[in-house]
Regions:
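Extracytoplasmic loops/domains of multi-pass membrane proteins
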Residues: 1-46
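Hydrophobic alpha-helical transmembrane segments of polytopic membrane proteins
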Residues: 148-170, 184-192, 239-245
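Junction motif at the cytosolic side of a transmembrane helix
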Residues: 167, 221, 235-257
């Protein structure tokens, strides 16, 4: 940004000053970028120019596209696939070792068993997301929103995984059928990336849980991230998750008979 009086400073031979703005994801390189720009301007103008970047950060909008949009999509898909693919096999392994049978004859209620399995699955999702976020931390502005997004996303993904693991008895069944709900969860995100969709799809997609999850990650990359703005998407993901756990508890109770 060229301030008033810049031309006069150049003509007087005094050190001129410019206001430089740096995108949030490059904030750690602000001083280096300013130094490079100062050298370039001094060569161009034959006079020293100081570029001030302190406090001048540019945040991406919550409807971000480009790299931020792609990162949000990747985070959503990794979260969904981790819970959706891994958890069914964890449940199947417990069926093979008869750990599940022991739990069913124990005093633990069906809801207790479901909560225990959900917590184990959520831990796996959290570990996977911690690794992914470690490589993308520079894009995150609101870590609180990211944590909430990961938690509700893990609840959704683990709910899908528990339902698949509880409903099938063999590894072949799990492998053959688990891909279908995962693809159904991934499809809205892929469609949203295409753009130019029919009006019907454009009206339906915002109600899909993976779209809401992606919106939460996008919001966390922006400077406008607040809990109030995140709440509708948080509630939407939770609303999709709740019926999954109700179904899992019902299946576990039937297995106990």
């Amino acid at each position: 940004v060229i301030p008033s009086g810049f031309q006069q400073a150049l003509e007087s031979g005094a050190e001129a000053e410019l206001e430089g703005h740096v995108v949030w994801s490059r904030r750690s390189a602000a001083e280096e970028l300013a130094s490079e720009m100062e050298q370039y301007l001094e060569t161009l103008l034959n006079t020293p120019v100081r570029v001030v970047t302190k406090g001048n950060l540019v945040y991406p909008p919550p409807q971000g596209t480009g790299s931020q949009g792609m990162i949000a999509v990747v985070l959503s898909l990794i979260l969904v696939t981790t819970g959706g693919f891994l958890v069914p096999y964890l449940i199947f392994e417990e069926k093979q070792t008869h750990t599940m049978d022991a739990l069913l004859v124990s005093p633990a209620a069906a809801s207790d068993i479901t909560i225990g399995k959900a917590l184990a699955g959520i831990v796996h999702c959290l570990v996977a997301m911690a690794v992914v976020l470690a490589f993308n931390y520079s894009n995150v502005v609101a870590w609180g929103i990211v944590v909430l997004a990961v938690l509700v996303g893990a609840l959704l993904a683990v709910g899908v995984g528990l339902l698949l693991g509880s409903g099938f008895e063999t590894a072949q069944q799990v492998g053959a059928w688990s891909i279908i709900p995962i693809l159904l969860l991934m499809a809205p995100v892929m469609l949203a990336m295409m753009g130019n969709l029919p009006p019907v799809l454009e009206s339906v997609l915002p109600w899909m849980p993976t779209i809401a999850l992606g919106n939460l990650f996008l919001l966390s990359f922006s400077g406008d991230a607040t809990l109030a703005r995140a709440l509708p998407n948080l509630v939407l993901v939770l609303a999709w998750s709740l019926p999954l756990y109700v179904a899992v508890i019902w299946i576990v109770r039937r297995s106990d008979r």
